């Protein structure tokens, strides 16, 4: 591993790392030290597995938001024996001091807050390129971009026409990046794919991509769906968004949320947390949903369930949380009231039709906050250019809830790296006993004391005294 650079001038793509400023490393380290006190799951795994080094020999290509919390994850993986190369999975989500702290430890990282799309795909390629000419053997993904890059590149080796018709700006840069790499190394992607033993996926959108590949028979390696671990989806997605959404809106706009009319589009775990977040500060919250079960849940929680087109002229705040495409379209945007706030807390930037807004007048207020003048003369406030608002305009989810998610990630990486031969080329979830273990590791930090079953009680409900306590189909 190449020594960490000592000045920004030494930060060259493909050498060791690309970060904004190595001088931020001390600041990043101080925040890392605080975060570790709030991440008991990861610290427990270091203590449990640190001497065993179960990830020795693992070469992990990581594509996940380069935050302080992710830095604790990275250092945990390294302490357990892995070699790691890291890029952010979003152009706005990097915390530059976190990236600097990781670079200062000599760990290759390629992430800058506000990087261009061209740079984004260059950096994602960099995590697949080991200095000795080798390849990663594991992928840790968030949104599926690293996995998708390997897969699409492999297809393009066989048929370059798959890159002929990009459907949006992101694909334009992705396709160009793949073409550039193929010109340099025509078999790069297939060689990389052949070395991958498994992938662990963090988020709903990336998991959907994996299941799509499994259904079509194209999944070339086993995958673990970390997102659907209960201690991820019911905590990170729900409680994380409950805190981070309003944090990002307040930091970006300084508006008073109380008294505002807010529409949350999508009432899954992320939408539930987002709705609670806005209601908690006094907003009147409505929900838009396509799923009758989620819609009924929202109604039973006291939210008014509406259609976007029926309320678009009345809402002060719009939040998309669907993981879907073109949810808020131009036909909705042009009808919005003056100073309406529009943001997205789903993984990708295509929930809001930002491309259609490019024809209007934009005024940048500050990073990731734009005023856009509509044909009506009204101006809307677009946050993070329609990308993840909680990481574009704030610092994402708190350390404690991310410890839940990242403890699952480490366990999933250990599982696939050490037992990969036992898994078929399918998508799996972590077993219930590991889910419960993750929860146990976090109880003490918040002063929670667990009641214990007696042997007779356990026998009565037909579960082991030590768990697992619920069947796999149980809905928490």
From Swiss-Prot:
The keyword Iron-sulfur does not apply. Gene3D superfamilies: Adenosylhomocysteinase-like, NAD(P)-binding Rossmann-like Domain. Its main location: cytoplasm. InterPro entries: Adenosylhomocyst_ase-like_sf (IPR042172), Adenosylhomocysteinase-like (IPR000043), Ado_hCys_hydrolase_NAD-bd (IPR015878), NAD(P)-bd_dom_sf (IPR036291), S-Ado-L-homoCys_hydrolase_CS (IPR020082). Pathway: Amino-acid biosynthesis; L-homocysteine biosynthesis; L-homocysteine from S-adenosyl-L-homocysteine: step 1/1. GO terms for biological process: L-homocysteine biosynthetic process; one-carbon metabolic process; S-adenosylmethionine cycle. It is an enzyme of class 3 (hydrolase). One of its GO terms (molecular function) is adenosylhomocysteinase activity. Belongs to the adenosylhomocysteinase family. This is Adenosylhomocysteinase. The gene is ahcY.
């Amino acid at each position: 591993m190449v020594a960490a650079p000592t000045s920004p001038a030494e930060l060259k793509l493909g050498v060791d790392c690309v970060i904004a400023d190595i001088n931020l490393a001390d600041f990043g380290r101080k925040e890392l030290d605080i975060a570790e006190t709030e991440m008991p799951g990861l610290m427990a795994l270091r203590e449990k597995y640190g001497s065993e080094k179960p990830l020795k020999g693992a070469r992990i290509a990581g594509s996940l938001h380069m935050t302080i919390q992710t830095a604790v994850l990275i250092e945990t993986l390294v302490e357990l024996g892995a070699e790691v190369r890291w890029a952010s999975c979003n152009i706005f989500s990097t915390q530059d001091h976190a990236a600097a702290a990781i670079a200062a430890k000599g760990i290759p990282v390629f992430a800058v807050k506000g990087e261009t799309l061209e740079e984004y795909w260059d950096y994602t390629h960099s995590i697949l390129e080991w200095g000795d000419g080798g390849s990663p053997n594991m992928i840790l993904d968030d949104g599926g971009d690293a996995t998708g890059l390997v897969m699409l590149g492999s297809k393009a080796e066989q048929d370059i026409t798959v890159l002929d018709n990009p459907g949006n700006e992101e694909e334009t840069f992705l396709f160009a990046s793949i073409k550039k790499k193929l010109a340099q190394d025509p078999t790069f992607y297939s060689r990389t794919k052949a070395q991958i033993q498994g992938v662990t996926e963090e988020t709903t959108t990336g998991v959907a991509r994996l299941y799509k590949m499994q259904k079509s028979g194209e999944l070339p390696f086993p995958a673990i769906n970390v997102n659907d671990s209960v201690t991820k989806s019911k905590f990170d997605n729900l409680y994380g968004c409950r805190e981070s959404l309003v944090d990002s809106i307040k930091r970006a706009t300084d508006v008073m949320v109380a008294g505002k009319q807010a529409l949350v589009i999508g009432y899954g775990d992320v939408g539930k947390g987002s709705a609670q977040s806005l209601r908690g500060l006094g907003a009147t919250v409505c929900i838009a949903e396509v799923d009758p079960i989620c819609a009924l849940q929202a109604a039973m929680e006291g939210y008014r369930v509406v259609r976007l087109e029926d309320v678009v002229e009345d809402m002060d705040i719009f939040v998309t949380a669907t993981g879907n495409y073109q949810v808020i379209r131009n036909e909705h945007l042009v009808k919005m009231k003056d100073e309406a706030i529009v943001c997205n807390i789903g993984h990708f930037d295509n929930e809001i039709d930002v491309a259609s807004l490019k024809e209007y007048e934009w005024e940048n207020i500050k990073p990731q906050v734009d005023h856009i003048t509509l044909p009506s003369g009204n101006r809307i406030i677009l946050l993070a250019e329609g990308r993840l608002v909680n990481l574009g305009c704030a610092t994402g989810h708190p350390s404690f809830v991310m410890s839940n998610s990242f403890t699952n990630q480490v366990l999933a990486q250990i599982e696939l790296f050490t037992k990969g031969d036992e898994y078929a080329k399918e998508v799996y979830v972590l077993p219930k006993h590991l889910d419960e273990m993750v929860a146990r590791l976090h109880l003490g930090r918040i002063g929670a004391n667990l009641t214990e079953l007696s042997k007779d009680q356990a026998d009565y409900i037909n579960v082991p005294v030590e768990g697992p306590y619920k069947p796999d189909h149980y809905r928490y």
